[in-house]
């Protein structure tokens, strides 16, 4: 698919919308030269969570960040239409003529990165997975059954009764309170993104956007040789179970920071990522 491109007059950043399945469009930004590096954001957030990395990484790489479907400036999903975030990521890569890329994901972005390791490792130069793991719950090959639909109906009703604003406030507090000594520095940027989030996902029948078990089966059997760095926060205990299936995997625990480590300790996070990628 051809990307609809525009050039921002005040910078060297290229931005636009990329058509994807179901008539949806994905907002993206691209900056820099060199090997491609793609940033994958977390749930309830958008491309702005990568502000501490985007310009810095673009000094060495061609950096792409985009809003997943249902977030930021990208299209909202259609109930009943099955898609995955991995398929949308591959659409972005194909549209921008990117064959292989370094993939950096945090939280939900890391879930998608692990999906890619299982199903499309040949399109990865390396991978950095922060605050996220390989999911093994039901994937798209197992449609939602009546029991799950009933549970979702109850969840949606409970959220409407509680109020979306209250849910967002609690979600924000959870992310901030998980942090270390610099946690208050992330409150403002997170509050802005979560405030702008439509909360489409918890208010609808969201399709299985993470490949999860479908990808995990392939991940376990393939033992992908892609260089992988797994980063966990100060609350982590023990090594990630995924390491035993990654011949070229490494693990780092970042102290004095929580789930949103890239925002809370950007200098340390940036150094970890850039040192790892440049050594490949």
Regions found by a protein language model. Give the residues of each.
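Hydrolases whose catalytic domains are alpha/beta-hydrolase-1, hotdog thioesterase
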Residues: 112-116
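Flexible "cap/lid" loop of the alpha/beta hydrolase fold
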Residues: 118-119, 124-160
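Conserved serine/cysteine hydrolase catalytic core
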Residues: 195-247
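Alpha/beta-hydrolase fold catalytic core
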Residues: 1-37, 59-61, 274-280
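Conserved HGGG/HGGXW glycine-rich cap/lid loop of the alpha/beta-hydrolase fold
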Residues: 21-75
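Catalytic active-site module of serine/aspartate enzymes centered on a nucleophile-bearing elbow/loop
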Residues: 249-280
